[in-house]
Amino acid sequence: MRDSAFLKTARGEQAPYTPVWFMRQAGRYMPEYRALRAGKTMLECIRTPDLAAEITLQPIKAMPLDAAILFNDILTPLPTMGLSLDFVGGVGPVIHNPINTPKDVDVLGVPATAETMPYTAESIRLLMPELNSRGIPLIGFVGAPFTLASYAIEGKGSRNYEKTKRFMYAEPAAWARLMGKFESVLADYLTEQVKAGASAVQIFDSWVGALSVYDYQTFVKPATAGLIERVKKLGVPVIYFGTGATHLMPDMASLGSDVMGADWRTPLDKAWDLIQPGQSIQGNLDPLLLQAPWRELKHQTDRILHEANGRPGHIFNVGHGLLPETPQDMVHRLTDYVHEQTQR
């Protein structure tokens, strides 16, 4: 497993070919996923280990992907801290008791995730025999402190994160306490995932691109640095990914992750120049291209591979999650194509 193409590349070593996996590779674009999810809520599937394990394995059984990513959601820890989470059709995740005041921060719990989310480790234990037999590593993941804080304050997804920024500016001490609580819970949660069998982890900072460089450095970087520092001690590669965050990449990369994720807005070679020497990079196809004609998908895949230029350390991925309308046969065809074109 340690010599898998994905793990070698995550460590910056040369692999026999460019490894491929996709964010949201276990998802609604797969008919078998829709069949298994029918009549079940998102949280029900996450909290039922045999369902979560099977969903994680579906794309691995269907396509020659180089890594599995645990079926989970970045918001899973929020209910264990005292926030009421629901997934509402047509809306997405909703927090029914969002954070409005410093007192709301102070009453948030910092639970031991082994006790409050035992289903996650059990899901991993159930799926590891299959992954081990295939030599496929598992990626565990969490949301980053800022992204979870933004959900907790906004109550749902937001375009501009006005409530989050107002709280951050008006209540800096409470904001620091909130970020510290998320740092502790998320570090503990990733520790449990690695102990159960994950051999790499990804930290999703989905909404960090809404921040200026100054605000990232002042209000977000300390807790995120603490999280990455704690997770690095687990001895597995750490991937750090933000959306719309090219302007933040030098600061994000300075936190010491092994791999930096890049979205599709910046050419891969330009993004690679923004990060630390020796860091690997992951990305960065626009996920909508998987719904384009093959000639265009092939053309832009060739462009990305040209930008990578055969350098060790490139993990091929989309620059955001796969969309529900994505044709599964295109995902399979693309995976095969990247493998064929990058044989070394």
UniProtKB/Swiss-Prot annotation:
Record: residues binding substrate: R24, Q25, A26, G27, R28, D73, Y151, S206, H320
CDD domains assigned: URO-D
Site (Transition state stabilizer): D73
Keyword Lyase appears in the UniProt entry: yes
Matches recorded under Gene3D superfamilies: 3.20.20.210
GO molecular function: uroporphyrinogen decarboxylase activity
Subunit structure: Homodimer.
Protein name: Uroporphyrinogen decarboxylase
Organism this protein belongs to: Deinococcus radiodurans (strain ATCC 13939 / DSM 20539 / JCM 16871 / CCUG 27074 / LMG 4051 / NBRC 15346 / NCIMB 9279 / VKM B-1422 / R1)
Lineage: Bacteria, Thermotogati, Deinococcota, Deinococci, Deinococcales
Gene (name only): hemE
